Amino acid sequence: MDFTIFPPEFNSLNIQGSARPFLVAANAWKNLSNELSYAASRFESEINGLITSWRGPSSTIMAAAVAPFRAWIVTTASLAELVADHISVVAGAYEAAHAAHVPLPVIETNRLTRLALATTNIFGIHTPAIFALDALYAQYWSQDGEAMNLYATMAAAAARLTPFSPPAPIANPGALARLYELIGSVSETVGSFAAPATKNLPSKLWTLLTKGTYPLTAARISSIPVEYVLAFVEGSNMGQMMGNLAMRSLTPTLKGPLELLPNAVRPAVSATLGNADTIGGLSVPPSWVADKSITPLAKAVPTSAPGGPSGTSWAQLGLASLAGGAVGAVAARTRSGVILRSPAAG
């Protein structure tokens, strides 16, 4: 593009900014180049240290495998530094073009002065001044156009850069694709195990459990046992009614024996209240009172028998539950307020 075809107002207006954005970008690329260079040096140092302590065919294969990656880091660092240098060149060209351009206020002053002289040039007395202003304006035009053309040329040259290349693949692409397929199949298998076993459920039951009306359905299901009980009661009533109808349709000759049949099969039940036999204050069956051979244990044991069973004190715990009964009735009760004293004590 030839910028000399544009008036100076246009060129001066478009180059009024500063070169600071270019300088910031150049600094960023420079820092990236330094970081990559440092990474390459550390990479080489680590690999050399590993090869020194680990020797053999495996060590050689490892060193040969990682060598392309170190070379890629070094190449990328060099390209980043080249980009930083080119941006710095563009920044310098921009600053030079900005300095070579005529300031926009100067051009505006030239145009306004010419307009005023042309307006008041009634007798041609301002014609020489008008020609001088036009010549100066033409110089501004040429100066801005040449500065913009020089800047455009330098910027286009700096934009021609060596493209960056991606690093070498870390694995065989075919094997990597196969690995992805295996991972996908494993995920599908695990997912099939983790999925709910809905295939074994009846479709109607699954629909019942998954519908939004499940609470209403659950309430309906909970009432089914009650309905069965009611149906059973109604069925028994129906059976009794049918039996009554059948009895009514029988002749008196057959009806009499059938009416006596329940009493013949089921014995009569009788009960009385408040007439039970008693022993003391305890109500007992009649057979207990009729059997006179039962003798209380307290009367059967002679009074001259030993006062207590032999053995340790633990053996006497079994008699604790008999206190107040047949055995406890003959035991002498000691008053808690009497203190026994030995005759020898006086």
From Swiss-Prot:
GO cellular component: cell surface; extracellular region
Source species, domain of life: Bacteria
SUPFAM superfamilies cross-referenced by the UniProt entry: PE/PPE dimer-like (SSF140459)
Sorted UniProt keywords: Cell wall, Secreted, Virulence
GO BP term, example: response to host immune response
A Pfam family of this chain: PPE
Cellular localization per UniProt: Secreted, Cell wall; Cell surface
Entry's induction text: Up-regulated under microaerophilic and anaerobic conditions, nutrient starvation and in the presence of palmitic acid. Coexpressed with PE11.
Chief localization: secreted
Region (PPE): 6-159
Subunit structure: Interacts with LRR motifs 15-20 of host Toll-like receptor 2 (TLR2).
Primary role: Induces pro-inflammatory responses. Induces host TLR1/2 heterodimerization, which causes an increased recruitment of IRAK1, MYD88, and protein kinase C epsilon (PRKCE) to the downstream TLR-signaling complex that translocates PRKCE into the nucleus in an IRAK1-dependent manner. PRKCE-mediated phosphorylation allowed the nuclear IRAK3 to be exported to the cytoplasm, leading to increased activation of ERK1/2, stabilization of MAPK phosphatase 1 (MKP1), and induction of TNF-alpha with concomitant down-regulation of MAP kinase p38. During M.tuberculosis and HIV-1 co-infection, can stimulate transcription from the long terminal repeat (LTR) of HIV-1 in monocyte/macrophage cells. Interaction with human TLR2 activates the NF-kappa-B transcription factor, which binds to the promoter region of the HIV-1 and induces HIV-1 gene expression.
More details: Shows a strong immunoreactivity toward tuberculosis (TB) patient sera compared to that of BCG-vaccinated controls. Could be an attractive candidate for serodiagnosis to discriminate patients with active tuberculosis from BCG-vaccinated individuals. Could diagnose both pulmonary and extrapulmonary tuberculosis cases. Can also be used as a novel serodiagnostic marker to detect latent tuberculosis infection (LTBI).
Family: Belongs to the mycobacterial PPE family.
This protein's domain notes: The N-terminal domain is essential for interaction with TLR2 and activation of HIV-1 LTR. The PPE region contains the information necessary for targeting and anchorage to the cell wall.
Name recorded for this polypeptide: PPE family protein PPE17
Encoding gene per record: PPE17
